[in-house]
Amino acid sequence: LLSSSFTVFAEELPHGNVGAAQVEQLLEVDVVNGTERIINLPEMAAYSMIADTASSDVALGRSIIGGSDERTKITNTTSSPYYGIAYLSITMEDGKTYRGTGFMISPNTMLTAGHCLKSSTSQAKSVTVYPGRNGTSKPITAKMTKYYVDTKYTGSEADWDYGIMVLDSNVGNTTGWFGLHGTSGSSIGTTNVKVTGYPADLDGYYMWTCGGTVSNITTNRFQHTADTAGGESGSPTYFYNGSYGNQAVGIHTHGGNYS
């Protein structure tokens, strides 16, 4: 069975705050001022809390379930919830460039996969964010000013493969953002999820989505059966939760062959 792994949030936080129960310290990197520091989560304002190796334009690994590709293209990328999902153009300190996906969780805060921001040999120097990108159409643009990765993440630890990005403008007031839904024991509140992002194998400048079911839930991760590809690292895994709207239950980090 091919499926992908996700970071699972610690508790239900319908207003878009990340639960602190599983995280002790974060590495803060200010890409504008070139500074770094270790911080404890309580030091951060809630709305600022907001990460495949970061998938390059040529790394087109696929995870297709059952031999049939069920991904569908999103044509109206400025409708909800799609406008809150962004194409990421990533430049690392070693000069290499990558692509990825991220999603808004507040006016100026975004989640992505940790490996989109940090590897074992380098880390992000700059990230340009294109919410709702649709081919050459880029309806809104922002730049990353700071990012946070867990201090336990050094480039390969799947349990801590998440990242938080702070942007230079409140683009979320235009795009909208996802609420966050956490776990309760072995349940994440749903058995069906969607994964929406920018897969590189289908011309990665367009947004695609696929539904799937969840399984193998652990404290920090779970697997799903949605079809994905390189470039979708950092995509939201989410479901529609009635009056709470679209809530993310995880961050897509990688695909693999699970049997």
What positions do the PLM features span?
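Protease-domain processing segments flanking chymotrypsin-fold serine proteases, especially trypsin-like
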Residues: 10-101
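Catalytic nucleophile loop of clan PA
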Residues: 227-252
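Acidic glycine-/aspartate-rich tracts in secreted/extracellular proteins
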Residues: 116-118, 133-137, 168-173, 199-201, ...
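Sec-dependent N-terminal signal peptides of Gram-positive bacterial secreted proteins and lipoproteins
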Residues: 1-10
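Cytochrome P450 catalytic-core helices
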Residues: 108, 112
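Conserved catalytic-core segment of clan PA serine endopeptidases
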Residues: 61-83, 89-95, 99, 118, ...
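Residue-level recognition of beta-strand termini and adjacent short loop/turns
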Residues: 105-106, 218
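Chymotrypsin/trypsin-fold serine protease catalytic domain
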Residues: 135, 158-228
